[in-house]
């Protein structure tokens, strides 16, 4: 069967840059799905995306659907013929509908009876007759949160559509999509190249667009070019460009013909904290800051323009003029803020609401102060510094800088605290209290910062859960999931041996009588343990491993982490699944015992060699493993317990647990109970699969 190249390009008004890549990828995925459902074989599907187009190029596309044999069952033979053997009206109607006579029908015999049947060959439809509808379906399923209408049309799409191109090799595929008839027209760059031109063959895409329209349609090609050119531009003056990937993606989505240029700003602005300048350059202007080899911000920036100019100096000058007022604002805010200390801003936090039922931000920082001190005592941090940092933690919200540039909260608090002469650990904690801000982000560096970060997160968790506002589905306005995962990461990765129950109880205590949920402590702890499960599964650790540990409900995250890693290692041992099955068997046996389970094994009641051997090993391991359990060395303990595989297998092969003799039965149940309790010191390994 001949294979073809299919092109679809949707020419639009400027598409939202932050959604461009996801739209193109979803378009490709959707078309693959539609082609598969239509039974049209295909090879690769390449996606292209620029500010004014979404395009797909399908290689090795089948020219038509494969022909199929379809069995069409008719009436049962008993109903197909009357008493004289003549076809009934039902049989004749069915045959006529299938283009045959009753005599031409075949017979299908099953164990339920005999039916008339006709095997029809259904010819596959040509791809060109299907592609228009398949593209329409793929576009209709794009994840577009907000649609637009344009002109006098009722049609909706993410942005107005101006051209639709569908080519199967060199043949134009007739279609009417989003109110536009398909044509060979492509639109080039707004200001360079040919504004409009026609394409003869799908194989010419995207090269023809680049050569005649001066548009690089390949998103990844533009991104690679911008990155390489920006790195080279920075290296030319000994600098290193801050090529933040999220910003790089956004800039890639803003241009069709990227040209990288370098500009400057006045050195006097370097007196302002670099974070504020960087926020202005990256967040507002989409510029790439440049640092020297030591990480110090340079008075330069790199930007990407969408045009090749005969006089780039004009574009450079224009961008310098645009950024200067923004940097001047930052300088003004910084100098003004320095006229007041952070501590002097504390009373004004009374005017900012944290949550209606939970009170103001001032009340929140007072709670953070107390809980941070509580945590500091337990992790060996300076209590006075932790409490001071907790009290000042939100004061920078009342500064001009943070009021204008909200993303600088925390980091500006650090700079202002340093200016005020606060201890360095306090200043650093003001910045690091929000860490980790996202998955994979850095953690607070020092113990004081850890105490404040944890106190802030537990205050939010206890408060919001305490008034019954649990996160539901995707709705999590107070970022409780992020707070829980962040707190767990701090405790495990910074090796802080804290108990969740103790921390939540303290966070609840300082709220006084504001909280109405009587089960808030249990709710928060369960919620956090649930976040643990999701986090480990993201790391590739099996759900059964985490469930085995969760069954024991250890509430010290550091201890929980050690157990998970130990069980994960144990699961890789040859003996693991056999011992897991044995534990499940033991669990089932013990579950049927009424009353209290026996624990004392009487040596004189050990009759069979197999139970004597198992009892000896269990007793020896109880003594040997006690210090390992106490030290939290669960991996070593489980590795030793793996040696029980053979004696356990032999025991179940040779010993009847539920003996007629009640004394023997009780003794054997005690032995199994002791065996199971050894494993339960770590996890319920009967849940391993």
Curated annotation (Swiss-Prot):
Question: What keywords were assigned to this record?
Answer: Aminoacyl-tRNA synthetase, ATP-binding, Cytoplasm, Ligase, Nucleotide-binding, Protein biosynthesis
Q: Output the GO biological process annotations, alphabetical, semicolon-separated.
A: arginyl-tRNA aminoacylation; glycyl-tRNA aminoacylation
User: In its keyword annotation, does this UniProt entry include Oxidoreductase?
Assistant: no
Q: Which domain of life is it from?
A: Bacteria
- GO terms assigned for molecular function: arginine-tRNA ligase activity; ATP binding; glycine-tRNA ligase activity
Which NCBIfam families does UniProt cross-reference here? glyS
Provide the assembly information: Tetramer of two alpha and two beta subunits.
Q: What is this protein called?
A: Glycine--tRNA ligase beta subunit
